[in-house]
């Protein structure tokens, strides 16, 4: 789903857009959801249109959810010669340990992400010097994501066709891994351009200066030993 708005006049033009997307996988354990936002603006600040200001914003947020083994579940199902021999249930109807369905229920691997970009630029075409222009721009990018990966023994399954109790659950096999990542990039650019034609000859020259400040940091933590799979949390 996408909604956009475009408009403006002779000296000012703008475009904005808001989009939403949701996709489900072959199993309800897989899903992807994303929201996008865009805002672009161009403005001529002087009546002779020699000074142009550009301002752009765009960002998105997304949620990517999948089981603990991720795509590996179906890679095994498609390429492993043993998987077709393991139906979802035993001959007695009991849910079978090690089946594709069982591997979809041994945890989760979820990632929440945010990304934002901003660009502002000012370009001046010098009126009294043909072909000469100067431009300054500032670009800012930041992103953040939080990953939670919880893995545990398969639940609600049976080791053999005649088992009288579900497969045992070992709390020590349950582990939770979380990671937080932040990234920022600030870029400043100043540029002078000169383009001129003299008869059959063309002359082009450019002077450019660029400066960047980059920052990134991440933190991760892991814990094992969960007596229940209902609400795994880290004690930080």
Could you tell me what each predicted segment is?
Residues 1, 25-36, 40-117, 133-236:
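Surface-exposed loop/interface segments of Gram-negative outer-membrane beta-barrel transport/assembly proteins
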Residues 2-6:
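Short glycine-rich, acidic/polar surface loops and turns
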Residues 7-11, 20, 196-200:
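A generic beta-sheet turn/junction motif
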Residues 19-20, 59:
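A short beta-strand motif that forms part of the nucleic acid-binding face
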Residues 124-126:
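His/Asp/Glu-rich mid-to-C-terminal helical/loop segments that flank catalytic regions of hydrolases
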């Amino acid at each position: 789903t996408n909604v956009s708005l475009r408009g403006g006049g002779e000296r000012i033009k703008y475009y904005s857009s808001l989009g939403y997307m949701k996709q489900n996988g072959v199993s309800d354990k897989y899903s992807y959801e994303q929201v996008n936002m865009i805002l672009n603006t161009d403005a001529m600040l002087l009546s002779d249109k020699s000074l142009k200001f550009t301002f752009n914003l765009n960002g998105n947020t997304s949620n990517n959810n999948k089981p603990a083994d991720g795509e590996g579940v179906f890679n095994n199902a498609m390429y492993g010669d043993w998987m077709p021999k393991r139906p979802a249930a035993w001959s007695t109807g009991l849910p079978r340990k090690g089946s594709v369905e069982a591997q979809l229920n041994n945890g989760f691997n979820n990632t929440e992400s945010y990304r934002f970009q901003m660009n502002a630029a000012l370009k001046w075409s010098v009126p009294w010097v043909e072909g000469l222009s100067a431009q300054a721009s500032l670009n800012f990018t930041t992103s953040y994501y939080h990953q939670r990966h919880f893995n545990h023994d398969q639940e609600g399954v049976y080791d053999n066709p005649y088992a009288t109790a579900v497969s045992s659950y070992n709390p020590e096999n349950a582990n939770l891994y979380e990671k937080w990542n932040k990234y920022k990039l600030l870029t400043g650019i100043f540029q002078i351009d000169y383009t001129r034609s003299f008869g059959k000859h063309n002359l082009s020259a450019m002077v450019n200066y660029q400066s960047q400040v980059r920052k990134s940091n991440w933190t991760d933590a892991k814990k094992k030993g969960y007596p229940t799979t209902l609400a795994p949390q880290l004690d930080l």
